[in-house]
Each structure stands twice: as structure tokens, then as C-alpha cells.
From Swiss-Prot:
Species: Corynebacterium glutamicum (strain ATCC 13032 / DSM 20300 / JCM 1318 / BCRC 11384 / CCUG 27702 / LMG 3730 / NBRC 12168 / NCIMB 10025 / NRRL B-2784 / 534)
Listed PANTHER family: DNA POLYMERASE SUBUNIT GAMMA-2, MITOCHONDRIAL, GLYCYL-TRNA SYNTHETASE/DNA POLYMERASE SUBUNIT GAMMA-2
Protein name stated in the entry: Glycine--tRNA ligase
Record GO biological process: glycyl-tRNA aminoacylation
Predominant location: cytoplasm
Catalysis: reaction(s): tRNA(Gly) + glycine + ATP = glycyl-tRNA(Gly) + AMP + diphosphate
Complexes and interactors: Homodimer.
Signal peptide: none
Matches recorded under Gene3D superfamilies: Anticodon-binding domain, Bira Bifunctional Protein, Domain 2
UniProt xrefs under HAMAP family: Gly_tRNA_synth_B (MF_00253_B)
Length: 461
């Protein structure tokens, strides 16, 4: 299946099975926001749980925080966001739609292998294909404004955070002192951020409200490059360990002239989404932010955010290595990479097309489905009791509707690793049939061994 059709198919699957809904759909929806349904929120939470386990609880040198969405306005002035967090905006004189000029230029270069000789004049309108007819680029702020207090005036002006990082930086000293940490160490945060994107789109890839998984790792100057490479390698391996095919991932080195104002070096981990205009899309950036953040916040707040190294009797401002990942983008990637179509036998002796999400078991929204072979009262008590017992450990679905093959298909397409069938023999032999998602192999397991059988195969879930 072509990759673009996988995007369309996955989007339809998400809407049909309750992973993702258009925000405010009864009012026409919006391209810039999506709601996560029952299965979507489980997948999202499982991704966050694996990130937190990898980045925080499995390491002795990283701790977590949960910082406010609305910070003092001066934080964003000092960090440079108010001044430089802008994008070049152009308007098509054909359709009067607005686009980021840098995105148009990048897409042209990726398609043709070279930048446009005449700049924007060589770029056709993305919607109509007409020869380019563009306004001059204008600076467009990516910050979303809000007002606190009874009057919408300058005094009450605040910003919704465009990144979680600044909340970490302003708490650097608090965390270092209360947690008795010292560089090299990291502070992690998962939370909502907001950016006034000019052209949100590509499903949940680019939205104005999104969730980030960020960690700021504070190191001694001079050790930053080694730690930067460590986190590039570690983060790339995290995606592979969770089942992403290595050939669908790549590292993209930001050219020096395109680095953010705080960055010494930035490397993106990208996935082959195969969007209409570009093959690769950024999953996360790993940036060497130097000492920029702690230095400017020391100057802006008057608070000393340096570190005194007692071993060397030196005082220095830590450099920061930042792996920053987008949760929605990660979820979209896991769904696309796991989507698979094959054939499964049906009750008539033939085969049917089977859709299966081959998600890593740690990510699967539902871990086990309990399926009584019949709705008859003789099976119901045992099946319901079994489902209740398994729910103490995992997210369990209980489905009694339709033929057993159809119920298997329903679980396959949401990625459920194991289906447990309670049949009439179960009443006699106290055993159930356990079916594995990917191989469709079935084994008979005694009821008193079922919990241990599943636990061995759901480690880390």
C-alpha cells in the first residue's frame, strides 16, 4: 500500500474506532485541533508512560516536573520568544491563503534538489497550481496571547507557552537544591504547548495545541558535545526499541544558518510520513542550547543560576542538551508504522482481508480481550469473572457481539495483543484459548495459569 494511502487509511481508522475525533465536529470541526477518544487516550498515555520510564524513572540522573502553562510574561521576553519567535508569512494573491515562506522554499528544494532560482516567484500556488504570485514576507508571531484579570489591556497580557522548556529553566535552582542533584543531570516535563501555526494540518502532525515530551539535561561546558551525541543515539534507539522500522527513520542535521537563536547544534529525528509535499517529518529535535537559557534568565531575573563545582573549585553556567519530542507526531508515527494488511481464514473455509495494528505490546491501548464464545448464560458468569480479574492488571475489553472471527478482526485492527476465548469446554477443563495477534496462533491455557502466562508476555505493560 502506498504510504499516502496509509495516512488516509489510518486517519479513517482513527475516526471509526475512536482513537481521534475532529474537535467540535458537530459544529463543522477544525483543522487545527483534534480530540482523543477512548482508545486514543490509552495509546497516548502508553506512549507517555514509556517515554517517562525511559527518560526519568529508569535513570538516576533525571527527575520530573509539571510546570504551568501560563508563565510570567517576562519569562518569554527574557528567553527571546517575544522578539524572535516569528515566522515569515506570505499570502497567495490567487487564493488569498497564507503560508510560511520557509516551508514553501524547503518543499521546493526537497522536490527539485535545489532552491528556486527566483525565490518565491518560482513556486506555484499549492492549492491551484497557478504560477506563484505572492505578497512580500511579513513577520508573524507564533505566540498565542491571553489576558489575565478583568481588563484586556497590556498589563494583563500573557502568553500560552510555546514550549515546556522555559518552565524547567526557571525551576532549575529549585530542583537542583530540593532534589540534591548536580550536573550532569536532567529535568523532564510532559505537557501541553501552544503555537499560532499559520498552516496547521496533516492530521495530528501539526496543530496549534499539542503535547510535548521534553527533557533539559544540564552539563559542564566542554562536555556538551559528548552528551549531545549520547542523547541523539539514545532517543533514536527508543523509537526502534518500540518497534519502528529503522529504514523509516533518519537524522537531519540543521544547517548552521537555520539554527534557532539559542542553538549550537540541532539534530532532528525524522520519520518517513510521505506527506503530499514532503517525505520526511520531524518527530523530535535534540538541541545543544549551550548556556543561553540559564545565562539570560540569570540576567533577566537577577537570580544566580550558575553551579559551583566543589571538585574543581570553579563556578560555571551549565550547558543544556534538549531532546524535545511531539506526542501527537509520535502517536501518528506508531499508528502508521504498525498498520498492516494480510489475510485470515474465515468460517466458510476461505480467507478475508485482515487489518492489524502491530503495535508494540507496551503501547497497545487494550492488552487483552475476553470473548465468550456464546452469549448463553452458562458462559457469561465465568467470562465476566475472568475479565474482572484481568482488569486488576491490564486494560481489558469484553466483547460478546458477533461471530468469534469478526470479534478477532475488531481486536486486531486496534492492536490488542491477546484474545482470550471462553468456550463450553472451559466449563469442563477450566481452560481458555489464547490467541496471539500477529501470528494468530492459538494455545489452550489453564485458568489458574492464565495470569502468569499473560504477565510473561506483557512485561513492561
Amino acid at each position: 500500500m502506498a504510504q499516502q494511502s496509509i495516512i488516509d487509511t489510518v486517519v479513517n481508522l482513527c475516526k471509526r474506532r475512536g482513537l481521534v475525533y475532529p474537535c467540535g465536529e458537530i459544529y463543522g470541526g477544525t483543522r487545527s485541533a483534534w480530540d482523543y477518544g477512548p482508545l486514543g487516550v490509552e495509546l497516548k498515555e502508553n506512549i507517555k508512560r514509556q517515554w517517562w520510564r525511559s527518560m526519568v524513572t529508569s535513570r538516576p540522573d533525571v527527575v520530573g516536573v509539571d510546570t504551568s502553562v501560563i508563565l510570567p510574561r517576562q519569562v518569554w521576553v527574557t528567553s527571546g520568544h517575544v522578539e524572535v519567535f516569528t515566522d515569515p508569512l506570505v499570502e497567495s494573491l490567487n487564493t488569498h491563503k497564507r503560508y510560511r515562506a520557509d516551508h514553501l522554499l524547503e518543499q521546493y528544494e526537497e522536490k527539485h534538489g535545489h532552491p528556486p532560482v527566483n525565490g518565491l516567484a518560482d513556486i506555484n500556488d499549492p492549492e491551484t497550481g497557478q504560477p506563484g504570485n505572492w505578497t512580500e514576507p511579513k513577520a508573524f508571531s507564533g505566540l498565542l496571547k491571553t489576558f489575565l484579570g478583568p481588563v484586556d489591556d497590556e498589563e494583563g497580557l500573557h502568553y500560552l507557552r510555546p514550549e515546556t522548556a522555559q518552565g524547567i529553566f526557571v525551576n532549575f535552582k529549585n530542583v537542583m537544591n530540593t532534589s540534591r542533584m548536580k550536573p550532569p543531570f536532567g529535568i523532564a516535563n510532559i505537557g501541553k504547548s501552544f503555537r499560532n501555526e499559520i498552516t496547521p494540518g496533516n492530521f495530528i502532525f501539526r496543530t496549534r495545541e499539542f503535547e510535548q515530551m521534553e527533557m533539559e539535561f544540564f552539563v559542564k561546558p566542554g562536555e556538551d558535545e559528548e552528551w549531545h551525541q549520547h542523547w541523539i543515539d539514545t532517543r533514536l534507539q527508543w523509537y526502534i526499541n518500540l518497534g519502528i522500522k529503522p529504514e523509516n527513520l533518519r537524522l537531519y542535521e540543521h544547517p548552521q544558518e537555520k539554527l534557532s537563536h539559542y542553538s549550537k547544534r540541532t539534530v532532528d529525528i525524522e520519520y518517513a510520513f510521505n506527506f503530499a509535499n514532503t517525505k520526511w517529518g520531524e518527530l523530535e529535535g535534540i538541541a545543544n542550547r549551550t548556556d543561553y537559557d540559564l545565562r539570560v534568565h540569570s540576567e533577566g531575573s537577577g537570580e544566580d543560576l550558575s553551579f559551583f563545582d566543589q571538585e574543581t573549585n570553579e563556578r560555571w553556567i551549565p550547558f543544556v542538551i534538549e531532546p524535545a519530542a511531539g506526542l501527537g507526531r509520535a502517536m501518528m508515527m506508531f499508528l502508521m508504522d504498525a498498520y498492516h494488511e494480510d489475510e485470515a481464514p474465515n468460517s466458510k473455509g476461505g480467507v478475508d482481508k485482515r487489518v492489524v495494528l502491530k503495535l508494540d505490546r507496551r503501547l497497545a491501548p487494550v492488552k487483552v480481550a475476553v470473548l465468550p464464545l456464546s452469549k448463553k448464560d452458562t458462559l457469561t458468569p465465568l467470562a465476566e469473572k475472568l475479565a474482572a480479574e484481568l482488569r486488576e492488571f491490564w486494560n481489558v475489553d469484553y466483547d460478546t457481539s458477533g461471530a468469534i472471527g469478526r470479534r478477532y478482526r475488531r481486536q486486531d485492527e486496534i492492536g490488542t495483543p491477546f484474545c482470550v476465548t471462553v468456550d463450553f469446554d472451559s466449563l469442563e477443563d477450566n481452560a481458555v484459548t489464547v490467541r496471539e495477534r500477529d501470528t494468530m496462533e492459538q494455545v489452550r491455557v489453564p485458568l489458574d495459569e492464565l495470569q502468569g502466562y499473560l504477565a510473561q508476555r506483557l512485561i513492561g505493560c
